[in-house]
A protein has these predicted regions:
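N-terminal intrinsically disordered/low-complexity leader segments
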Residues: 1-19, 30, 147, 173, ...
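Helix-turn-helix
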Residues: 23, 27, 31-65, 69
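Hydrophobic alpha-helical connector segments
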Residues: 65, 69, 80-114
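Hydrophobic recognition helices of helix-based DNA-binding modules
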Residues: 78, 106, 163-167
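Secondary-structure edge/capping motif, primarily at the C-terminal ends of alpha-helices
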Residues: 85-89, 116, 120, 170, ...
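Hydrophobic/aromatic-rich alpha-helical bundle segments in the mid-to-C-terminal region
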Residues: 93, 113-114, 125-196
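Helix-loop "lid/cap" segments that line or gate small-molecule binding pockets
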Residues: 100-107, 118-121, 142-145
Length: 196
């Protein structure tokens, strides 16, 4: 909390990682998507970027820190659109831009999205990670028109599951990105109770 009583907001877009840390995080994201967190060792990450396991450990003391950092850099891609939508008090154009970016990120990182939604280690870590919880609350408060009560939280969980499930489901693997994007945008608008 700040001295004024408002919640300190963790801005993912402002996180600073060194070049070495970014190499670890990028390699880890790909390996997590392929093998899951438990199936990815620090040695595998080290081998992927051509360094020793000790070099990876020097950048991040635990695999959990790598998981959190990797998720934060991905969510950082949404921070600018989220801030714009918050500044616009949830105006339709800003919300549409934010929703488009959420969908674009999900489509562009399909394998990772599946891992984020189903890997038990990631689910546990993010469930306990306050900055992630704050980010998701900010995101869905904007998308749901300023509400984040119990009903809104259930809607948010359903929408997140719907987007993540839709981009990774075997029924849509043959769809091109443009078709999937258009269908997903329209259906998500309905789930949000919005129409543009």
């Amino acid at each position: 909390m700040t001295s004024g009583g408002t919640l300190d907001v963790h801005k993912f877009g402002s996180l600073q990682y060194s070049g070495a840390q970014m190499r670890v995080l990028v390699a880890a994201l790909d390996l997590f998507a392929e093998h899951g967190v438990n199936g990815t060792s620090l040695q595998m990450i080290a081998d992927e970027i051509g360094v020793t396991k000790a070099a990876v450990y020097h950048q991040f003391r635990t695999k959990e820190a790598i998981v959190v950092g990797a998720v934060e850099i991905e969510l950082g891609n949404l921070e600018e659109a989220l801030e714009a939508a918050e500044a616009d008090a949830g105006g339709p154009e800003a919300v549409e831009t934010l929703l488009n970016q959420v969908i674009e990120l999900a489509i562009g990182r399909r394998r990772l999205v599946g891992t984020l939604q189903h890997d038990p280690v990631i689910i546990r870590l993010l469930g306990d990670h306050e900055p992630f919880q704050q980010f998701m609350q900010r995101l869905f408060t904007v998308l749901l028109g300023g509400r984040f009560d119990a009903r809104s939280r259930v809607r948010a969980a359903m929408i997140a599951a719907a987007i993540g499930g839709a981009v990774t489901h075997p029924l849509v693997t043959d769809l091109d990105d443009e078709t999937l994007r258009g269908e997903l945008f329209g259906l998500t608008q309905r789930l949000l109770g919005r129409s543009y």
